[in-house]
Every structure is written in structure tokens, then in C-alpha cells.
Amino acid sequence: MKVSRYDYTSKCVSLLLLSILFPLHLYAQTNTVELKVVDADNGNGIEAATVQWKPIGAPSFKNGALTNRRGIVQIQAKGVDSYVVLTRYVGYETAIDTLKSSIKKYTIRLRANARELDGVVVTGKSKVQFMRESPEAITVINGKDLQGRSVSLETILDKTIGLKVGQTGGLGSSSRIIVHGLEGNRIQILWDGIPMSISDGTFSLDEIPIDIIERIEVYKSIIPARFGCDGLGGAVNIVTKEFSTDYLDASYELGSYQTHKGSVFSRKNFPKSGILLGAGGYYTSAKNDYSFRVPERENLLVKRDHDRFRSYMLKGKVAFTKLWFDEISTEFGYYNRFNEIQGVLKNIQHAENKSGMFMLENKLIKSGMLNDRLNFESHFSLSHTTNNFVDTARVNHDFEGNIYPSPNGQGETGDVPHNSNDKGLEINERINLDYKLSTNHSLNLNTLINYAQRQPNDDIASQHAGFIIGGFPSKKTSIVSGLTWEAKLFGRKLTNMFSAKYFHLHSEIEDLTSYEMIEAPKKKSNTTSQIGWIEAMKYEPFRGFHLKVSYQRAIRLPNSQELFGDGIITFPAAGLKPEKSHNFNLGFLIDKNDVLGLSRLQFEVNGFYMQVSDMIKLMKQHMAAGYVNAEKVHIKGIETELKLDISPTVYAYGNLTYQDVRDVLDYLPGTQAPNPTKGLRLPNIPYLFANFGAEYHSDRLFKNWYVKAFWDGKFTEEFFYFWELTELQKRRIPRSFVNDIGLLLTYKNKYSIALECHNLMNKEVWDQFRQPLAGRTFHLKFRYVFSKGIL
């Protein structure tokens, strides 16, 4: 009988699988027990909990391990019928369980220790504390400190050491994050470790509901390879909450200038089937109609009467947790945004922008493979965006109330009218592998593949200009892959992290050779590859003192907006090169309990130095602008922060940042003409700023009530908003000092009300590009939480 090629191949594959699985089956006969440590209230796995075990009757616990990020640890109890398991974690009561050796899986539920949670300082380290003590220059903001507050994410970030948020207006306005003197696209924004596409202005951070945040990680002058992304100045990783139990979180906020924010997030768990369903969304709107003095005409006070903003997002999720994978989940959502265009130097009354985005995400997680050594995670995301910018008015306005015909026939914002219909597609696939070599050595491999394409269309603009002004269909593919080796040496006093990163970019752009004439577009391609690396060390000579040093050869690939343009005022730029930087950090962290009469003292100092080349800059070209590699910058600075738990109920903090960002380019791009701005500070980047505040909090002032009252102050020194080449050019943003106060009341961990006043003294504040910000504002927020433990 003749054996087909298919049968032969099937037998070979079967034998191969048998040879692999049979030894694993034999190994599985050994007495290995999987323990999962969870929060008794919400069912979430607890990472870094200490688990120790011993045979019944043994005098002491000699074996121990820490749970992984999902709260799981595997132990081996050989030669005994029963054994005792001791589980501890800071803020929770110690659990003691007696197990029979026949048990293969067991869940340990830890209950919160009420005394410890009331402010009494305890020994041990939380997830936030573990991260703060990592070798990277990092600041971690605990989401628990933000819950229930009537404040935006941008406001929280703006008070962080080493970080500044440049704003242009009220809710929904464009903003940029500045870390160690680098800003905008050079700072990566991540959502649960996945890069967010917000550089095109489709989405703004101040829309994100603060109550869904678990923590915020701010990496400064360094971007860990485990994120698989590029960037120069650092990264902000927003980590959201995950709950394994049923919950409902609903809030509504009312603020000045007709600001409204509402959000609802829910989750339903079916523990027997391992199915988890989630749904939620938010809505934000604001009129932003505050008054301001027109720059360069400061005796003219006008009202922002064309700055209305509205957005909403709807999301749904289904997850399976009892399959071979620890989690298989699919998440889908839709985002919609509308905003009017407010003029500052010019009175714009008709231009507006509408955009939408459909999102799909899929996640696969498997941990504990290869004898609890290998963890795997795959994250796939797809987003499809549409954008419609409308500027077709035939009349223009000035701030004195005069109306006159548009100088260009149509339009208010530029040289040509617009009615765009742009479409974009972006696909990401991230694969992350963690492998534990030994107790003190581990490897991490992370690869992020990104594909983006853009299809612009603006017939009105093209007809008016005489050529295709919105650009042509374009696409790009990028790959960022990083391998990290982490070693803990000398009794775990020294932690060393070394990473190598590979960057690859290929773009295909249809563009015109010259915008001065009508011609057929030509396809231009650009391919580049770069290597970067990171070396970071932390040394802890004694408990509570950490010395950190790090270096990164940083690379940032041009993003979609820079390569493709925006179809409105920015042309494509096919020949862009990656930005490059040498980043250095040196600092120390002190964290001590019960010292100098204080419950806790935290003090840190960090110095940084960076050499940046091939910086991408927007430059004017004919009727629009395009991005070019045109800047070279050196940055040096220092930051320091002091946090004091004066008592279990009183807390105070203060931080100060100084950063000197200088242009060091010798000649103007493409010429031998001397650069007139060499040696000058870059405009729109504050060089000296500070934050400080105090807080009182207690859950014993009134029965069943948690009370928090706080004051925050923010100081920013005067800085330039444009180059000052002569003494006569006073292009400066004045010094500012702003105070915020607030009160938060929470009843039985379910109902909360927050009242806040921002800019208490109603100071006049200007920000980047001399944009006027709102004066005193009031905010009132109500929140209801169904699930205990969500706060």
C-alpha cells in the first residue's frame, strides 16, 4: 500500500509532538502545585507577594518565592502528604493555609489590613515602590491617589518632577508633553504598554477619565526596550485597572465654561465558565468661552466664542480566562470628536474639525510555561480614522466686530480653503517574551511591528491651489525590537539592565517634485535601519538608599504625520531621517520610614545630559510647510523632589526642575550660512519650574467617611515663545504662580463627591506660543462605585 505524502508528514509531526510532550508529561507527574494569590475583595492577582511553605511539623519555613505579575507561583512539595503555606504582602493580613499534596491548583485570598490601610507605615514594597527602585530614571504616580478627584490627566502630569505639559487652551485643545527638555513626538505616550497614536491630534490626554487609571509611569531620558517603541526624551505609560469581579464605576463632573464630563465603566465576571464581559465609555464637552487679552494687542480683551469641543468614546470587551491561554480577549471601540477652531491672533468664526476612529484590539497571555520560566504576551491592534477639516467661509472677522470678504475668496485659517476627507489605517502587533534564566537573571524580548497608511483628499484645496495640496496615498512599515538582560548581583544589591534595540523603517510616499507646477506625483521610498542600546544600573548599599546611573543611545523614527503630512498645511516629507540622541542620567533615591520624627521621608536627585542630532523641524514651504531634519541640540539639567509623610494623615511634597536646552547647529540647513540661533535656548520650553503642595487625609474623622483636603502650587519661570535675536525682540511668556485647592469626601468606599478650584487667585496665565489659558475655574464631581476595593 502506497503511503501518501500527507500521511507521511502527519506521522512525522505526530512523532515529533510525542517526543516533545512525553517528557513533559513525565515531568508533570512530579508534585508541582500552582498557587494564585489574589485580593479577596476584587479577585485581582497580587504581584510580588511572598509565599513560603514547609511540611507540617517542620520548625521553620525554608522555602520561599515571589508571585509573578498575574499573582501566580509554582512550588514543589516532595515527599510529604500535607504542608503549610504562609503568604504575606504589604497592606494585607498574613494568610496561613494547609494543603494536601494531591492538590494541583489553589487560590489564596488575602484580605486588606484595615489598620495598615489607615496610614500606618508598614514594611514591604508595593508594585509602585518596586518600579520606583528600578534602574531607570522613573517617576510613578499611584492611581489610588487620583481616584474621585475632579482633575485632568494633563494637570496631574504637569505637577510631576522633570515633566511639563504645554497647553494651548481649555478642554480638548492641543497640548504637548515636555520631559527633560524634549517634547511632542519625542515623548512616547503608551496605553498599557502599547504606543498611542495621538501625534495627529485625533485624541487628547485630558479626555481620559482619571478613575480608570491604576498608575502612571513616567520614564525620563530612557525608554525601556520591553515596550518595543522608539522615542528620544522618554515615555509616559498609562496603566489601566483590571478587575476580576463584577463592578460598576460611574461619574459625572461639572466645571466652569460649560464643561461636562461623564463616564461609565462596568464589568461582569462568570467565574465558572471563565468569561469576562466589559463595557463602558465617556462623554466630554466644553464651551471654553473664557476671555483673554490678544497677544501683541494686550489692551484688547476678547471672549473665546468659537472654541466649543465635544467627544465621546464607546468600548466593549470579552475575555476568556479558562482556556490554554491565561487570557484571550478582544476589545472594540469607537471614538468621535468635534472641535471648533479658535483664533488667538485672528478672529476665526467658521472653521471646524470632525474626526472619528474605530478600534479593535486582541490580546493573548500565557504565563508559567517551561517550568514557570517563560511568559508570553501578544497584543494586536487596528485603528481606522477619518478626519474632516472644514474651512470654506467666504467672509472673515476681526476682533473689533468687522466683517470683510476672505482675501483668498474662501477660508479663514490659511492661504486656501479646506473641506478634507482624509482616511488613515494603523495596525500594530506586539510580541513580548519574558524568560527567567535563574533567580537573579532574566531575559526579555519585545518586538513591535507597525503599519500605517494614509489616504488624503481635499478637492476644494487642490482646485484653489492648482495642484494636489492634500497629498497622495502613502504608507509606512516600522519594526522596533529589543532584547534586555537583567541581572541582580552581590546579594541583589546591584541591579544591571542591558538592552539592545533594532529600529527599521520603510516608507512609500507619493509626492510632487515641486509644488510650483502641476505635474504627476512620483513615488518616493525611504528605508533606514538603526541600532540603539541601553545600560542602566542601580546599587543599594543599604536599605532605603538607591544610586542610579543609565545611558541610552536613543532613536526616534519619523511618525505618520511627519512623513505623510496632515493634508491641510503640512506636505509629505519622504526623505526624513530618524532622530538620534545620547542620553545620560545619574541620580539617587532615599526612601526611609520612621526617620527624623516623620512617618516616611522620600528624597531624590537626578542629573541628566543629552546630545540630540537630526531633530525633525517643521519649516515653511510655499503655501504650506514640511518637516525636515534641521536641528541639533544639547540638553543638561537637574531635578529634585522631597516627599514627607509628616504623620499618618498629613503629607507634603515639593519638586524643582532646571533644564538648559541649547541650539548647537553651526550652519543653517542646506547652506554654509552661520546659524543665528546657535547657543540660544530653544523657545517654548520652560527652563525652570517647581511644584509643591500639602494634603490631609483620614478615614477616622467621621464614621464610614474618607476625607481628603489638599493644596497644590505650581511655579514656572519666564521663558521665550520665539527666538530673541535682538534686545528689541521681547518674545516672552511671563512668570506664573498658580494655586489649586480641593476637597474629596468618600462614603463607604462607594459614593464620593469632589470640589476643586483651579487657579485660586485668578492669575493670568500664558503657555506655549503665548497661548492664553483660563483663569479661575471650579469643578464639581460625583462618583458611584459598585464594587468594593475599586477605590
Please name every model-derived segment.
Residues 273, 286, 377-379, 540, ...:
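Membrane-embedded beta-barrel scaffold of Gram-negative outer-membrane proteins
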Residues 38-42, 49-54, 86-92, 103-147, ...:
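Short, acidic, small-residue-rich periplasmic hinge/interaction motif at the N-terminus
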Residues 493, 503-505, 600-611, 628-720:
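Gram-negative outer-membrane beta-barrel transporters
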Residues 245, 253, 270-351:
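Periplasmic-side early beta-strands and strand-to-turn transitions of outer-membrane beta-barrels
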